[in-house]
Amino acid sequence: MNEFMKKFSLTKPIIQAPMAGGITKPRLASAVSNQGALGSLASGYLTPDLLEQQIKEIFELTDAPFQINVFVPLGLEMPPKDQIKKWKENIPLANQVNQFTSVQEEWDDFYQKIDLILKYKVKACSFTFDLPPEDAVKELKTAGCCLIGTASTVEEALLMEERGMDIVVLQGSEAGGHRGAFLPSKGESAVGLMALIPQAADALSVPVIAAGGMIDHRGVKAALTLGAQGVQIGSAFLICHESNAHPVHKQKILEANEADTKLTTLFSGKEARGIVNKWMEENEQFETQTLPYPYQNTLTKAMRQKASLQNNHDQMSLWAGQGIRSLTEEISVKQLLNQLCQEDIKI
Amino acid sequence: MNEFMKKFSLTKPIIQAPMAGGITKPRLASAVSNQGALGSLASGYLTPDLLEQQIKEIFELTDAPFQINVFVPLGLEMPPKDQIKKWKENIPLANQVNQFTSVQEEWDDFYQKIDLILKYKVKACSFTFDLPPEDAVKELKTAGCCLIGTASTVEEALLMEERGMDIVVLQGSEAGGHRGAFLPSKGESAVGLMALIPQAADALSVPVIAAGGMIDHRGVKAALTLGAQGVQIGSAFLICHESNAHPVHKQKILEANEADTKLTTLFSGKEARGIVNKWMEENEQFETQTLPYPYQNTLTKAMRQKASLQNNHDQMSLWAGQGIRSLTEEISVKQLLNQLCQEDIKI
């Protein structure tokens, strides 16, 4: 049992990725935690009230540790009006948006969620999109909460460690969904795990967790061989029975292959990997002109919601990683965890 | 000893990547082969005469098997004159180019190289850029030459197997230098090895070799765990004493980190991963407008040659993979192979 597993008394070195947008709910997270891996709630798009409801619910379903993931606000100011106008004209239903969440409101939301994590003594809190602010880090650490940061390069991972993270999740280029990259880089900040894990493991003192493209025991063993202490799995949990992902999203993952995904900013303004669909194809030439997160995200919200209601994959965000060729049937969390940890893993 | 190692009586499951452009010469390839791994000559930018010279030379230096890599011509017709004119105006010294190699000349060059491989009974021939033509495959196989194809997706790997390849090299997104992708894909055809290896190993019957971002024994072990029978290493051999790479290229790799590289078409017209430099930065907005290979390559040749002569990294192609943070000193091929196969690898 390594340091990461010891922290949570895990029997499996697996984290279920905190997939926001309604995919991850207490049912999925508790099923994972009850099997000896670390389940996750994703608070990113939840109001504090809804998060509190989910926390209460998960405590009914499991006594085992779980984590809550929080988006760190980027604090980017409103883009120029003409850019907003252009996108409002281009994105279906975007003209319904009358105002955006202010930076202050984003931070209020963030701190209300931190307060809930403290109030309910949640065992672990993970951060995505940026370094968490020092005051939140201090409060959570004082309360004994284990802190998990997300990094896509060694430089980012080192900053996360310096900020007080107890564990750093390394997001490989293979990973589906939003990228956690927060530093400018000279080249591509999306680095394959085969290269990223050993370079980060050598540089950091805290345990690193590998995220991206792994779907079975071979990936888990390879990541541990490369120096990770655990593996974070997204797409493979997304298609589980217990996951609340949209049936069309699940179906698209079951059908898709490894070269069907790409990184796009067209849905949210922040780079994320998803299965290419009509919205991405039709707007490819505008990839570099999207509004920064969360503005683009706010404008595409009604379009995505309508697409969900109509089971229309053309305008949904079909987040998925590069391991999806091997995902061909919906199984249970228990079955998946058995595939991931088929035999004893020596660590 | 697995099937791949048996084919060449190797003691180490390692291929030295065939890096064209003067990096890989008989000295490097023979040093690798003499240590029980598979050395490679890169015929891509050599004339048949120069290739023959290198073949004679390597036979003086080793009795062990080695391979020769051949570029498969893409056969793309000349781009429109106005596009050529635009690039001639933009690329330093490009106005020296009066004519391009014709598609027929490219094929003549290809078949002359195949004839040399047959004449000298070279043990293995690898192909990059496309499926090799059926007549060449047939001739080489009849002569007992082991054929190695390059693929970046499972679909490409399956086509390579179908075409008669005995081994398929899976080029992960981590890999430096030119991408071997040859099929259009819905999303990104650059897939991380962590996802690519198991998906391809499950689909293919012939041995697969992993290429990209690996620099030490952890990467080798992880690749074998994922289902590869061997590992192809580029950047780490490029900086070896025995490599003929430009000293500035070596130095840049020794200094660079994992997020300093990106895929670019600006040097050759074909996507390749290299350390970001001034030429790439200044022309970033033209990435999607480059001429197809080999036309862009022909136009940048004089610029690159002058940059090499002047030790000017701003206009050289600094090909490198994503594992380069860990490469910090020039070592010998023997030292590198000991790092890659530190202990016995059970396969």
Curated annotation (Swiss-Prot), chains A, B:
GO BP, sorted A to Z: response to toxic substance
A GO molecular-function descriptor: nitronate monooxygenase activity
CC cofactor: FMN
Disulphide-bridged cysteine pairs: none
Broad enzyme group: oxidoreductase
Pfam families named among the record's database cross-references: NMO (PF03060)
Reaction(s) this enzyme catalyzes, per UniProt: 3 propionate 3-nitronate + 3 O2 + H2O = 3 3-oxopropanoate + 2 nitrate + nitrite + H2O2 + 3 H(+)
Cofactor binding, per record: Binds 1 FMN per subunit.
Keywords assigned: Detoxification, Flavoprotein, FMN, Monooxygenase, Nucleotide-binding, Oxidoreductase
Enzyme Commission number, as recorded: 1.13.12.-
Residues that bind FMN: 69, 171, 176, 213, 232-235
Function according to Swiss-Prot or TrEMBL: Nitronate monooxygenase that uses molecular oxygen to catalyze the oxidative denitrification of alkyl nitronates. Acts on propionate 3-nitronate (P3N), the presumed physiological substrate. Probably functions in the detoxification of P3N, a metabolic poison produced by plants and fungi as a defense mechanism.
Further facts: P3N is a potent irreversible inhibitor of the key enzyme succinate dehydrogenase in the Krebs cycle and electron transport chain. P3N has been shown to be a toxic metabolite to bacteria, plants, fungi, mammals or any organism that uses succinate dehydrogenase.
Family assignment from sequence similarity: Belongs to the nitronate monooxygenase family. NMO class I subfamily.
Protein name: Probable nitronate monooxygenase
Source species of the chain: Bacillus subtilis (strain 168)
